Amino acid sequence: MHQELIRELAMITDEERRILEGKQEIDPQLYTEKKEMVVDSAKLLKKGKLIQVRPHTRFVHFPAHTHNYIEVIYMCQGTTTHIVNGNQVVLEQGDLLFLNQNAVQEILPAGEYDIAVNFIVLPEFFNTAFSMIGAEENQLKDFLVGALCGRDEETSYLYFHVADILPVQNLIENMVWTIFYDISNKRSSNQITMGLLFLQLLNYMDKMEAGGRKFDTEIMANVYRYIEDHFKEGTLSELAVEM
């Protein structure tokens, strides 16, 4: 990523300054008005906007929460550790994480040089990307369908290890740049860029990890464990009883 952009994203925000001065936790009112911790797009997006980027808040633990929008996290440098639906996800430089509205996320404290950027995205922003990726069924499309329709899909997050894929890195940096610097006429440009990003990611599905709800993940783990332990004499009836 361009060093000028890294320097801008690395600047200490007002929220981070308060944390460094001794505040031990996030201020929930910056993110939601609700009792439950559902991060609200209305707190982070200007009226009429479909997408925004903001640097990830460092130096503090971010407790378990969901979002009423789609969050895309890009790791610019360093690492961040996330617990998503009970699974540990460690983002390294160049990694990309998509979370839908059903993903439960917790974030461990990041250091000064751990720079991540969060895309706050309303589902309708992905309409162009959806139309660009065609009719073929795949987990990327399933994720989009669930996000666009608000369905409680099994695929609630997608994690891409794409640091070495130059076209992907260029497309992400282009979106961060145009949104962060508020370049004019950017909406259609960024919607098409997101579509191009998805088309590129379809070429690298071998670099993707997908995760569902914690309950589904645990069930699948138990199924695999049962098959491994009883691969000769196991039956579906016995498996059903164990489940």
Language-model regions, residue ranges each:
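Ligand-binding loop in jelly-roll beta-barrel domains
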Residues: N102-I133
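Short hydrophobic beta-strand segments that form the core of ligand-binding sensory/regulatory domains
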Residues: E71, T81, L96, E106, ...
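Amphipathic alpha-helical segments enriched in hydrophobic/aromatic residues interleaved with Lys/Arg
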Residues: E4, E8, I12-T13, E136-T193
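Short, Lys/Arg-enriched, Trp-marked, Pro/Gly-tolerant hinge/linker segments that flank
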Residues: Y157-V162, I179-I192, L199-E238, E242
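Short acidic-glycine-tyrosine-enriched beta hairpin
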Residues: G86-Q101, P109-G111, I115
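Generic protein-terminus/edge-of-domain signal
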Residues: M1-T79, E137-Q139
